[in-house]
Amino acid sequence: MPDELDGGNNFGSLDCTGRRYNYAGQTYRLCDVDEDARYLASPSTNDLYFDPDATYPPPLKPDGSSYPDADYTNAWVDGYAAARTDNPVTVDLGTRYAALMDPYFHGGGFMLADGTDPNGYLDEAFYYELQDGSGCDTLIPPDSCFSARKHPSTDEEKQAFANWYAYYRTRELSSRLGITEAFIDQPESMRIGYDTINSSWVERGVRPFSGEDRTEFFEWLQTHNAGGGTPLRNALDTIGGYYESESDEGPWADEPGVEDGQSADTFIECRQSAAILMTDGYYSGGNPGVGNVDGSNGDGISGPDSETYTYESGSPYADEHSNTLADVAMEYWVRDLQPSVA
């Protein structure tokens, strides 16, 4: 935390215990940020970390009401999960806070007994403040540029830290909160679908953003845990294929998801549609093999009033690279996905 290390230890050389440790409901190696890594626990150099000058209100529930404030001495590891279970995992931020841990522990050795802390890595919740000085304006300032550990000192600051810990501290938690705020006031006339980027089909096609469909979207968003790689190109290709569907249950039907025999030539024309991809990094995984789409001229597209459009390869879209994420996006933008629609 705020986000765990990856297998390649992308944060550089950190002092992490080689013993496996049961903490916050999972098995980790605990890491010490007080030596050569203070920048990870300062809001000046890590935008995701707790900022004493910021406010951290609880996120919104699917019905628009707020989740409860977290408890500083019994803070939820996942504030969203706390609403779904009678026995949520919690941490006492007054005595047992760990700023960073590594889930990719060594397979050998033995598990440390729960509750022990032989290396002294657990402490009261803390943060570092960046100081002025020579060499302190670099991307990763040395430890000498930071203050000693500062702990929440007022009830207001402790409440803010507890809420940050329960609802904001990781990219996944922050994404849930931000997406909820972005969509909570969207009109019911909008159609929303959703999926994970690791699946080979669209989990939930577009539906009117109302009633049970609206509630189910927020519940899925706030309960789904991230996992696996980031095959963004294949994910976008899957969505593009979905938008090409002429099924009476497909995205262009009057009632998507309902099998009613509607023919494709009666679908509504010129309906604006988009796909939003959320990821924690660059794309990986398979290659859909679309080629250098943005580097080639497109076919003509007919529109209303006998108007036509043809993509002509050029700046700012064209390049010399094939099968990029931009090529997949262009593949489904440059073509008429529903040529039979009148």
What do these predicted ranges mean?
Residues 1-342:
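P/S/T/G-enriched low-complexity
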